[in-house]
């Protein structure tokens, strides 16, 4: 029997990059504490990203309450869409989330060098129905290195630098650039810029055209719900912290 191709939709095999939240402990109180600690400095980093819960690292015989983990992720504004489990972990299908098959292609999420390794968030390819084209996945630099971006960043794209970040092209509305060090933007900033995300109060943001949705240093942020003054909006500026307050100052380039 042949099926006529529909002009309205089609179903076919495909894959989509998403995040895996890899669970390595059954102590949910400790997991919740570490999760909140990780995200409190950069609450916008994974906001509204889809994520699959990966329980393959648990020891034989261990199990966790997936409904509780699902709620934890919702609390930090992530969107759980499925579970990745071993064939022997039949209990993983009891949480009301679909079981997904992952093909490992890992990019480690940023973490402070002096921290013990908590449950990591990693990017992997997860089998799913093919959606509309998605923005490119997060790009993460090697520890301590300056990351240079010379292409425009579209809405939904995220860049994370473990050192300083230099951007040579526009950052569109809905795009997000994050650095543990300083951020230099030699183009319009219309999205979000977060510097010093692990508590570096000496970090600064330098920008040649400031039109942001959000700016932040060491977790202290400002949105443009309160309009920026005319003498800095669209102008070259530097942004720094002074006594826990963001200071936005004109940047003299000549």
Curated annotation (Swiss-Prot):
Keyword Chloroplast: no
Coiled-coil ranges from the UniProt annotation: none
Cysteines engaged in disulfide bonds, as pairs: none
Keywords assigned: Cell cycle, Cell division, Septation
One Pfam family in the UniProt entry: MinC_N
Top-rank taxon, per record: Bacteria
UniProt record, GO biological process: cell morphogenesis; division septum assembly; regulation of cell division; regulation of cell septum assembly
InterPro entries linked to this entry: CAP/MinC_C, MinC, MinC_C_sf, MinC_N, Septum_form_inhib_MinC_C
Keyword Cell cycle included in the entry's annotation: yes
Family (UniProt): Belongs to the MinC family.
Assembly description: Interacts with MinD and FtsZ.
Alphabetized NCBIfam families for the sequence: minC (TIGR01222)
Function: Cell division inhibitor that blocks the formation of polar Z ring septums. Rapidly oscillates between the poles of the cell to destabilize FtsZ filaments that have formed before they mature into polar Z rings. Prevents FtsZ polymerization.
The protein's name: Probable septum site-determining protein MinC
Originating species: Burkholderia ambifaria (strain ATCC BAA-244 / DSM 16087 / CCUG 44356 / LMG 19182 / AMMD) (Burkholderia cepacia (strain AMMD))
Gene: minC
């Amino acid at each position: 029997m042949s099926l006529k191709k529909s002009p309205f939709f089609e179903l076919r095999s495909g894959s989509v990059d998403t995040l895996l939240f890899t669970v390595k402990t059954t102590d949910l109180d400790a997991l919740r504490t570490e999760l909140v600690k990780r995200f409190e400095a950069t609450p916008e980093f994974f906001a509204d990203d889809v994520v699959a819960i990966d329980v393959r690292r648990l020891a034989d015989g261990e199990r966790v309450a997936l409904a509780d983990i699902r709620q934890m992720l919702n609390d930090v504004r992530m969107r759980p869409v499925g579970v990745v489990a071993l064939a022997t972990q039949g209990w993983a299908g009891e949480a009301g989330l679909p079981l997904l098959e992952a093909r490992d292609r890992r990019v480690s999420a940023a973490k402070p060098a002096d921290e013990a390794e908590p449950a990591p968030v990693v990017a992997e390819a997860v089998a799913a129905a093919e959606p509309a084209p998605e923005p490119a996945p997060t790009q993460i630099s090697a520890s301590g290195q300056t990351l240079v971006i010379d292409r425009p960043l579209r809405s939904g794209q995220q860049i994370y630098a473990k050192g300083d970040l230099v951007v040579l092209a526009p950052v569109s509305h809905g795009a997000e650039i994050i650095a543990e060090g300083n951020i230099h933007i030699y183009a319009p900033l219309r999205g979000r810029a977060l510097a010093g995300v692990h508590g570096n109060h000496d970090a600064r943001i330098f920008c040649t055209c400031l039109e942001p949705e959000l700016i932040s240093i060491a977790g202290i942020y400002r949105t443009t719900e309160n309009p920026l003054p005319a003498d800095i909006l669209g102008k070259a500026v530097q942004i720094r912290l002074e006594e826990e307050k963001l200071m936005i100052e004109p940047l003299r380039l000549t």
